[in-house]
Amino acid sequence: MTNALYQSSINSLPLLGHGKVRDNYAVGNDKLLIVTTDRLSAFDVIMGEPIPDKGRVLNQMANFWFRKLAHIVPNHETGIAPETVVAADEVEQVRGRAVVVKRLKPILVEAVVRGYLAGSGWKDYQATGKVCGIELPPGLQNAQKLPEPIFTPAAKAEMGEHDENISFAEVEARIGIALARQMREISIRLYKEAAEFAATRGIIIADTKFEFGLDDNGVLTLMDEVLTADSSRFWPADSYQVGTNPPSFDKQFVRDWLEAVRIDGKPWPKTAPAPKLPDDVIEKTAAKYREALTRLTGEELK
């Protein structure tokens, strides 16, 4: 497959680590180079095959939202071109898929906002009538819009482990009451503004995950990726129906295939190694990512 980068290899900068999708390098003491690869992770397991262009799509989408939402909260962007911090023979690895960002102290809580009942939120609700300890009205259906968006944080897990939904009280205990409340308020504001914009483009943002860090002055700063097809559930508004799982512009396609696949007659146990993705699943997933970018931002892949 062409246009695919499974793992970067930037030897001119110190490697800090490979995440599920991103490779991080140090740029001096106060900045990072983040390279978004074409790796795909589903159920917290990294697939063995890259999805062509996925990293560039995610990078362009995140940059679009960072600019659009900058009036709500500071973000990690520096405006430095990634091509200027690597060696000449490494430029192709970063072109269109990397950013140079401020080095922040990460807050180890995923700030999840849900406007609709879906995924693990729907499962929690079916079992308990609540999501992350938040009581919801009885009788809601799968994919139903919630009366108001809710903040349902998760504890950031180690690589390969599943993030765990936690209550707001637990977030307060972990990071302090004032910071927890600020994070909740900003996350809901970001979600509402993004959802309002996406609606004008015929897309429903069912839920999304934000990540924050603190800068040297202790200022809450938006980081990592924002409102991409990896960190959000995007549904086309024209085929949305309550009570069904709407087809989404993200890796749901891969998740559904993984749920259905049988290995030696048994379901895949959602642990590494992942089953080999068929070419048609890879191609359809790549097309979904590109379509999400165009539909949402009006931009073609640069």
From Swiss-Prot:
Statement: the UniProt record of this protein carries the keyword Nucleotide-binding: yes
A molecular function GO annotation: ATP binding
NCBIfam families on file: PRK13961.1 (NF010568), purC (TIGR00081)
Cellular compartments per GO CC: cytoplasm
Name the UniProt record assigns to this protein: Phosphoribosylaminoimidazole-succinocarboxamide synthase
Origin organism lineage: Bacteria, Pseudomonadati, Pseudomonadota, Betaproteobacteria, Burkholderiales
Domain of life: Bacteria
Species the sequence originates in: Cupriavidus taiwanensis (strain DSM 17343 / BCRC 17206 / CCUG 44338 / CIP 107171 / LMG 19424 / R1)
Keyword Nucleotide-binding part of the UniProt annotation: yes
Single biological process term from Gene Ontology: 'de novo' IMP biosynthetic process
EC number annotated for this UniProt entry: 6.3.2.6
Gene3D superfamilies: ATP-grasp fold, B domain (3.30.470.20), Phosphorylase Kinase, domain 1 (3.30.200.20)
Top EC class of this enzyme: ligase
